[in-house]
C-alpha cells in the first residue's frame, strides 16, 4: 500500500509532470501498442494506430487525465475510480492485465522525459501508485 511518504512523492512528482501529460500519454500509449501489439485489439475501431497518430495522442491524453484524477483521489482510489472501473470492466471489457502493461510504459516515459526528477524514490512511489491505480480499476472485475 501507499505510505504517507509515497503519496507526498506522487503528488510532488505529478505537479512537475502534469504540464506534459499529452506528450507522456502519447508516448506511453504509442510504446504499448508497438511493444505489446496484442493490446491493439481494444482499439481496432480506430482508423490509425501508428505511434503519434491523432487517435493515439487523443486517447493518451485521456489516460493521463485519468491518472491525474487518480492523483487527486489518492486517499481512496477504489471509491474514487468506481465509474472508471465500471467502464473498463463492463463496457470496454479491457483485460485488467493491460493496466499493468500501460503502467510500465508510463514509467518508461517518465524516466525518459524527466531523468533528473525520476529518482529511484520517485520510481518506487510512482510504481506503487500505478499498481494501486491498476488494482482500483480492476475492482469491478471481481
Curated annotation (Swiss-Prot):
One of its GO terms (molecular function) is haptoglobin binding. PROSITE patterns: GLOBIN. The keyword Signal does not apply. GO terms for biological process: hydrogen peroxide catabolic process. O2 binds at residue 59. InterPro entries: Globin (IPR000971), Globin-like_sf (IPR009050), Globin/Proto (IPR012292), Hemoglobin_a-typ (IPR002338), Hemoglobin_oxygen_transport (IPR050056). Residues 1-142 form the Globin domain. SUPFAM superfamilies: Globin-like. Keywords: Acetylation, Heme, Iron, Metal-binding, Oxygen transport, Transport. The modification N-acetylserine is found at residue 1. GO terms for cellular component: blood microparticle; haptoglobin-hemoglobin complex; hemoglobin complex. The keyword Nuclease does not apply. Hb2 is a heterotetramer of two alpha-2 chains and two beta chains. Involved in oxygen transport from gills to the various peripheral tissues. This fish has three hemoglobins: Hb1 (major, about 65-70% of the total), Hb2 (about 5% of the total) and HbC (about 20-25% of the total). Hb1 and Hb2 display a very weak Bohr effect and no Root effect. Belongs to the globin family. This is Hemoglobin subunit alpha-2. It comes from Trematomus newnesi. The gene is hba2.
Amino acid at each position: 500500500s501507499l505510505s504517507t511518504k509515497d503519496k507526498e512523492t506522487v503528488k510532488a512528482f505529478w505537479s512537475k509532470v502534469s504540464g506534459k501529460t499529452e506528450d507522456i500519454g502519447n508516448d506511453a500509449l504509442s510504446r504499448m501498442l508497438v511493444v505489446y501489439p496484442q493490446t491493439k485489439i481494444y482499439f481496432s475501431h480506430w482508423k490509425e494506430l501508428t505511434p503519434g497518430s491523432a487517435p493515439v495522442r487523443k486517447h493518451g491524453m485521456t489516460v493521463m487525465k485519468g491518472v491525474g484524477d487518480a492523483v487527486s483521489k489518492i486517499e481512496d482510489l477504489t471509491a474514487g475510480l468506481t465509474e472508471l472501473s465500471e467502464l473498463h470492466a463492463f463496457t470496454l471489457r479491457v483485460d485488467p492485465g493491460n493496466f499493468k502493461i500501460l503502467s510500465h510504459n508510463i514509467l518508461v516515459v517518465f524516466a525518459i522525459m524527466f531523468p533528473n526528477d525520476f529518482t529511484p524514490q520517485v520510481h518506487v512511489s510512482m510504481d506503487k501508485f500505478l499498481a494501486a491505480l491498476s488494482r482500483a480499476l480492476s475492482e469491478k472485475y471481481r
